[in-house]
Curated annotation (Swiss-Prot):
Pathway: Pyrimidine metabolism; UMP biosynthesis via de novo pathway; UMP from orotate: step 1/2. One of its GO terms (molecular function) is magnesium ion binding. Belongs to the purine/pyrimidine phosphoribosyltransferase family. PyrE subfamily. The lineage of its organism: Bacteria, Pseudomonadati, Campylobacterota, Epsilonproteobacteria, Campylobacterales. The keyword Hydrolase does not apply. Transmembrane segments: none annotated. Orotate binds at residues 120, 148. Pfam families: Pribosyltran. Its cofactor is Mg(2+). This is Orotate phosphoribosyltransferase. The keyword RNA-binding does not apply. Homodimer. It comes from the Bacteria. Its EC number is 2.4.2.10.
Length: 205
């Protein structure tokens, strides 16, 4: 699936938003990808997950389980696990820390792929990885529907940015790169005009 097609999917779902946004990473941006609007359509969710699964299979990665950080990554992760024919689990934030709950367990050495809907710096994905690794599993890679251009994905010429948090030694799969402006709160030009950011993401609402 080409970049143009994926971008069109987001536009048709009214999921490519322009404005002033506070991202879950704490940074500000003039664009936001609201994947929930895309994934509310089961057929679209299935097709995106199948395309992502094809890339992962072509790479030859062995996966036992897909794990996603709640809430934003759950739909994407579940559909990807279904496309790959593997188990799905999720972590959720408890008192500020990503935690595996609800009876989910991982085995020692279990090969886990961490999946988000969108990865910017990858902070939440890494927190989920740390939790399953603490319990004995082995994280073998990361995946997302789209990469906001800070982490280097398999098959992309974009270079890894200094604030990327995904470990560079593990493969990162995404269907496309969406490169939008990203600002620290202190340097945000939108804030300097008096605009206040809104927070449409998964931390806080």
């Amino acid at each position: 699936m080409s970049r143009l097609n994926i971008e069109q999917v987001y536009k048709e779902a009214q999921a490519l938003l322009e404005g002033h946004f506070l991202l879950s990473s704490g940074n500000h941006s003039n664009f936001y990808l609201q994947s929930a609007k895309v994934l509310e359509n089961p057929k679209v969710a299935e097709s995106l997950a199948k395309a992502l699964a094809e890339e992962i299979r072509a790479f030859g990665l062995t996966i036992d389980t897909v794990c996603s950080p709640a809430l934003g990554g759950v739909l994407a992760g579940y559909e990807l696990a279904r496309a790959l024919g593997v188990r799905f689990i999720f972590t959720e934030r408890v008192e500020g820390k990503m935690t595996l709950r609800r009876g989910f367990e991982v085995a020692s050495g279990e090969k886990i792929l961490i999946c988000e809907d969108i990865i910017t710096t990858g902070g939440s994905a890494v927190e989920s990885a740390m939790e399953v690794e603490r319990l004995g599993a082995q994280v073998v890679g990361y995946a997302a529907l789209a990469n906001r251009g800070f982490c280097q994905r398999v098959g992309s010429s974009l270079e890894r940015k200094p604030n990327a948090k995904l470990p560079p030694h593990l493969p990162f799969f995404a269907l496309d790169d969406f490169v939008f402006d990203l600002y620290s709160p202190q340097d945000c030009p939108l804030c300097k005009t008096g605009s206040k950011p809104i927070k449409p993401g998964s931390r806080g609402n």
